[in-house]
Amino acid sequence: MPLEENPACRSRRSFLQLSAAAAAATVGFRIVTEPMLARADSRPFPKDAVVIDANENPLGPCGVACSAVTDMASQGGRYSMWMTDDLVKTFSDLQGLKPHYVLPFPGSSEPLHYSVLAFTSPAKSYVTADPGYEAGAHAAKISGARVVRVPLTKTYAHDVKAMLAAAPDAGVFYICSPNNPTGTLTSHSDIEYLLDHKPKGSILLVDEAYIHFADASSAVDLVKADKDVVVLRTFSKIYGMAGLRCGFGIARPELLEKVAEFSGWNAMPITAVAAATASLKDERLVPERKRINATIRQATCEWLSKNGYSFIPSQSNCFMVDAKRPAKEMIAAMAAQNVFIGRPWPVWPTYVRITVGTQPEMERFQEAFQRVMSGAATASLTPTPEASFLNLDGLVIPASRA
């Protein structure tokens, strides 16, 4: 069903958008990203550190992507916007989409934030899972929207019926599937149910950052059907391009135009575009990396189960484990072992998120985790000044790991 649109709605929306933009300028608007949430400082890690805290891919860009970056670096003095058109066409052809349904960005954080700014307001709430990825809530605060957090179901899926009941005034329903931080899925049928029963004028913002790791159906088919859906994709996860920055907002043109009102139409970094295009053309990349990630994740979870540790089964490149103590203490204790794990979520105060690293990295994680859990590293459980915690919009994140 098309979004309701009349001159009065346009006028009011324009006013709210201008208000949001003014508020953003006043408070120093920042796009919150996974590295910002995972880390509060930019100092180098200690030597030989195991870094499994920000859902990065330790494999990095694939070979053809690295070659593409090298080949393109000497042309960095040109905008070369035609390359972005080629990237969009390559992706659109693979997905069976029309090119004007795809808008490229440096990663998926920007379209996430801009979508929230475009479709929420003081009268239009932002609805998300708890625990869930926090960045959209930050954008909702900029727009003056009410942030509604709804607990996951017993199977750790988004509780779409509870989300509907919690916010009849919703502007955006944010669905991250697989979910960050749990790595669990929300079924396509549940997403369709939410779409069929949502308030008129609202959208579903479906974040598929981790979809390539999972056995799951994409919501791109709903975009093809011209539904009120914006799908987010990124090259930061399975493609290993977190530092290069490339992603897409995918929606029917009317919705993308509203998102673009906040972003403009800027040139993309050509090295990222070249690497992304080359990666899409490598047919073996996704299935091979999915297999590697699943094998290492399964082996790690089998070890946790064998040793009596509680965790949440995942279909992503991360999972959550119960530390049986305050999460921030566990994070500090693991950091003292030179193993850096993910941040806590207030709703589950004893759970920590673990990114799936390489097999040697996960073996070192197991050694450090067992030492801490057995009490062998008890002296590390009290956070030192270097492991103290900051608070960013109510989000607890580590201040230092040196």
Task: Go through each PLM region and give its residues.
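PLP-dependent aminotransferase-like
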Residues: 118-175, 196
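Active-site pre-lysine segment of PLP-dependent enzymes
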Residues: 160-168, 181-204, 208-238, 254
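PLP-dependent enzyme catalytic core of the Aspartate aminotransferase-like
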Residues: 333-337, 345-402
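Phosphate-binding glycine-rich loop
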Residues: 76, 86-125, 143
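N-terminal secretory signal peptides and thylakoid transit peptides that target proteins
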Residues: 2-23
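N-terminal "arm"/small-domain region of PLP-dependent enzymes with the aminotransferase-like
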Residues: 19-78, 93, 161, 168-169
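Conserved PLP-binding catalytic core of the aspartate aminotransferase-like
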Residues: 152-154, 294, 303-337, 360, ...
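PLP-dependent aminotransferase class I/II
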Residues: 228-305, 309-312
